[in-house]
Each structure stands twice: as structure tokens, then as C-alpha cells.
Amino acid sequence: MSFRMNRRRFMQSTSSALAVGALSSVAGRASAQLPGELRVMVGGGDWGKANIEAYVKPFEAETGIKVQTITDDILLAQMELMAQTKNATVDVVVIGIGDIGAAVRKELVEKIDYSIYKKDELDGISAAFKHHYAIASSVYSFNMVYNTKAYPPNKPRPTSWSEFWDTEKFPGLRVMRSGDSGEGPWEEALLADGVPADKLYPLDIDRVFASLDKIKPHVRKWWAAGSEIQQILHDGAADLAHSFDGRAQLLIDQGAPVEINRNQAKLTFDYWVISKGSPNAENAQKFLEFATRAKNQAKFSQLFSLGPSNLNAFKLIPDDIARKLASHPDYKANSIPRNAQWYSEVGTDGLTNQQRFAERWKEWSL
């Protein structure tokens, strides 16, 4: 999500030397690890505070394990350096679903020990959120969002991506997510072109861009950062938008004339992972199990508007808050989980599918 991913992507676009320097900074602040300790990337700002309140403090109280929180973003380049030098200075890291494939291929992460999870907790976590080497920390989505001044509830408005693409029936200024990172409106373009939701993968890259050709003249801006789409929605500079649900929800909570359409939402999520060679791997496994319990995720989601990966958490979240979250059970039937495995697959050209989309976007957007 924008709170983390935009900053991460910016940093990944800089030199590897910067990444190494950042890791050295983390390591320099860290003393030698001891039994009963753990270093966890929690992130900064309100997200980091929510991670500390919902997970870190109660974990310390329950286990007696002392957690050192890391507010810096930890990049794949840093994780690779830790693995190469056999010096894992951060035990638990949050990464995006687009990074898990590379992390596994490069042997940067440990396997998750699901044997320590209680059955009822595991049953609450859908298969899409469980990976051999990672487990989803939180869930968010890309949605169609209305400017209710242009499209009030009593006026016909698009409810599917095919209707969003229908600019004659539903005129107005549109804004959509840029594909510069390889994470663009690919699934939405195929849905607009008539591909059934359960037949999206493998994505047909030529068909995606043929569909985008049709909507391109009607898109006022292709936004890259969450702050951009939030400002656009705040200013009323678009009638229809392709947006993070969380950015739109923040404005709704502030009384802005914005409404989220949950139909055909694209679900995506971040992963908790354990750094390869972590000297505190056992404690890290305990932390991940703790951080995916329904009770603790329910607390987190009430502090920060990200959906829980353990759907049992919704039994503990007040309904008015629960319905603001992308992973709410009522939205499941009409949502499309992003296929992390497919995006991370490497082709004969040595590129992942995500990288291939990023390259194609650069050519197409010129």
C-alpha cells in the first residue's frame, strides 16, 4: 500500500549503494543479538505505531521476548546482503507480494513453520494469504471510486470495469494507476474486455494493452503515488478513479464527496517474512504466529485501516469499521485476489511477469 510501497519503490529506484548504506545504518544501531530478543521491521508513521500497539507490545508481554523495532524500510537488496554476509540484522521484514518470488529464488527468507499455529487460526487465513515462505500481514485493494458530485447515488453510474471503460454511457474525467512499477490496472483492463474473473491468469499482456488503448484518451492522469490519488480525489479533479481503497476511505471519513465501489475490487497484500539465517528464527516464527491471530489482527485493523488476513478477526471488529476493510467477507465473492505467484514467475528472457509489464508500460506510455 502507499504507506509503505510508494516509499519502497522510490528507494528501489535508487542505487544499490544507497540500499547497502541503509542496511549498514540499521546494523550500526543494533547490538549483537541474544536469546530472548527479536528485531522486527514495523515501518514508520501511523502504520508503525499500529504494528507496535497491536503486535509488538502484547507479544513482549506474552512471551517475555524483547523486540527491537525497526522503522526503516528493508529492501530486497538489503536482505540479499544480509544473506550473503550471513549477518541477519533484522529478523522479521514486511515485503510486497511482488517481491516474494525473488526473495525465495535468491534464498533470502526462511520457511514458515505452520505447525505452531492453532487450527482455528489457520482456518481463518485463506490459501491465497499463506505461502511456504511468507504469510500475509494485511490486505488492501484497488477499487473504482466515484466523485459523488459527478456521480451521486441517484444517478446511473458504472459498477463494473467494462462500464468504467464505457465513456459514452458514463462520461467524465478519469484517473488510473500508473504501471511504471509493473503493478498496474492489468486485471481491470482484461475484465473491461470481457475476460471472466476466474480466467484472468495467466494475464494476456497484448490484450491488456489493447484494452488500455481504448481508455487511454479518457484518462486525465496516471497516478503513481498514493498521495497523488488522495489529492486528486480531495480536489475533486476526477469524476471516476481507479484508487487504493484506503486513500479513498480516509477522505470519506473526513466528509469528502467520495464513494468506493467494492465490486471487482483487486485484492493485494503484504507479507511477513523471516530473514534467511536469522539468529532468532524461532522467536521470529513465534512473532508471525502471534501477529496473524484473529484477536491481534482485529486490534490492528481498528488502529489502521488495513484488512486482516485472518478473516476470523471480523468477528471481533465493530461492523462500522469492518465494512471499511478490503478483506471483509461480504466483499469476497466480488473481489479478485492478485496472483503473486504468477507475477513472480521468470520467463526465458530472465524477467518476471511483473518486470515484463513494467517494460511494456514504459514503451506504451511514451
Residue ranges of predicted features:
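N-terminal secretory signal peptides and thylakoid transit peptides that target proteins
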Residues: 1-21
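A ligand-binding cleft/hinge motif common to bilobed small-molecule-binding domains
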Residues: 100-102, 234, 240-257
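Periplasmic-binding protein-like
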Residues: 140, 206-215, 252-278, 322
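Conserved C-terminal helix/tail region of periplasmic/extracytoplasmic solute-binding proteins
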Residues: 334-366
